[in-house]
């Protein structure tokens, strides 16, 4: 909230016209007649009603005796009343009360406490806060002062006029405390502070220790101690090295003292030294841009395919695809018809191609470390079966080029593609129903080819039955048949992809059957 947003009401009083009731005037006249002893007569004020009966003399005598005992303890005589009659009761109260009007706020110093109680009570305050109905203690105090003045000098007056214009201190809550203070005397207790004098009557009085140590109202505030927040910040700065929030812990420095700079000033962040070549730099940016000669790029090369990795874990994951599988000796032995194909060896020797860095995740039927996938036409060895099939396809294309020109063959499928074959040669596959072209497309051969290629070892056969018989006898350990259809695969990942693609519902049912059934409640 901005400063000065709330408007405070001023405590200064403004002159207000008011009228004193007639009943109070009659009571004041009755009190003046026995107490003043005819010392001073005041013109009566006409009242609309009959006057009340005078109080009994016993009550007046008791009031005079109590007030005389209270004034006997006071250290000095009461102040002399102002001379002259005060007959004006209407209009501006300054005409009837010529004493200067004071502000209800108390000064900073305590000089006003040295005055007498009645002088302070009658001169301080504003007529606006005067009581229309004075309390009995105030009436007794006014009557006693008049009696004392009459007995002492003979020309005194009673306090009835002053009671009509009494300040706010003669209210119900403070009249008895003021009378008790006057009866106690100034030396029996500590004087009242300005804050205690301005405190409303309903609140409890402040303890003596608080009153004695209360600073002045407008005095400059003493400089307070350092804020605890700043102290907390300094405390946190000391604990930066062991901050549990960062998750780090800075270890202690070396035992020997660090070397100082040439200029003599200390570096706030320490020395910027390369930990490998021990070279020192002026700032952290120069150290970051420094390329140490000892830092070399470490390469992890696969011994099977010469593929390079930057992490040993990646190389270990890659080498799982290079598990050596023993190839039967019958597959390594050359076929008798290999001599008849010697002419095609020179023609198709340059057409073969091999990838330098093949992908490790696609094929799992890789050869051993020596590359035992050998072509029977040209005795060329390959690390992977897919490379051998691609090479054999080039041999077949070269053989067909000598005869009728065949149509362009489809691109060679990967090793995990489907290869459908059945248990016996008498059974007919669905692919053969539409002709030999589709089956040849699966094998990567043209429709006009009269030989059938073994997908594992690359051997060619003149008929489909001979190829299936060869696969059953020699490559039964490397065949992965499908559980839901007669298709057969030569790699476990190929079979897994086939099941996920072609048999997702059956695979899901198998997984659910493996989970134990919960008994019904």
Curated annotation (Swiss-Prot):
Sequence ranges of Pro residues compositional bias: 43-58, 76-85, 404-415
Family matches, as InterPro entries: INSM1/2 (IPR042972), Znf_C2H2_sf (IPR036236), Znf_C2H2_type (IPR013087)
Positions with biased composition (Basic residues): 1-12
Alphabetized Gene3D superfamilies for the sequence: Classic Zinc Finger (3.30.160.60)
Keyword flag Protease: no
Localization in the cell: Nucleus
SMART domains: ZnF_C2H2
Region (SNAG domain), start-end ranges: 1-20
Recorded phenotype for the gene knockout or disruption: Mice die during the second half of gestation; lethality is caused by heart failure due to insufficient catecholamine synthesis. Display pancreatic, intestinal and sympatho-adrenal endocrine cell development impairment. Exhibits fewer terminally dividing neuronogenic basal progenitor cells (BPs) in the neocortex.
Region described as Necessary for interaction with CCND1: spans on this chain: 43-56
Composition-biased stretches (Basic and acidic residues): 334-346
GO cellular component, one term: transcription repressor complex
Region: Disordered, residue numbers: 1-59, 76-107, 180-230, 320-369, 398-419
Tissues where this protein is expressed: Expressed in adrenal gland. Expressed in the dentate gyrus of the hippocampus and the wall of the lateral ventricle. Expressed in pancreatic and intestinal endocrine cells.
Biased composition (Low complexity): 209-223
Keyword terms: Cell cycle, Developmental protein, Differentiation, DNA-binding, Metal-binding, Neurogenesis, Nucleus, Repeat, Repressor, Transcription, Transcription regulation, Zinc, Zinc-finger
Gene Ontology molecular function: any one: DNA-binding transcription factor activity
Covalent S-S links between cysteines: none
Zinc finger (C2H2-type): 272-292, 300-322, 373-395, 452-475, 480-503
Region (Required and sufficient for interaction with KDM1A): 2-7
Similarity annotation: Belongs to the INSM1 family.
Function: Sequence-specific DNA-binding transcriptional regulator that plays a key role in neurogenesis and neuroendocrine cell differentiation during embryonic and/or fetal development. Binds to the consensus sequence 5'-[TG][TC][TC][TT][GA]GGG[CG]A-3' in target promoters. Acts as a transcriptional repressor of NEUROD1 and INS expression via its interaction with cyclin CCND1 in a cell cycle-independent manner. Negatively regulates skeletal muscle-specific gene expression in endocrine cells of the pituitary by inhibiting the Notch signaling pathway.
PANTHER family the record matches: INSULINOMA-ASSOCIATED 1, INSULINOMA-ASSOCIATED PROTEIN 1
Quaternary organization: Interacts (via the N-terminal region) with CCND1 (via cyclin N-terminal domain); the interaction competes with the binding of CCND1 to CDK4 during cell cycle progression and increases its transcriptional repressor activity. Interacts with HDAC3; the interaction increases its transcriptional repressor activity. Interacts (via the SNAG domain) with HDAC1. Interacts (via the SNAG domain) with HDAC2. Interacts (via the SNAG domain) with KDM1A. Interacts (via the SNAG domain) with RCOR1. Interacts with SORBS1.
Protein's name in the database: Insulinoma-associated protein 1
Organism: Mus musculus
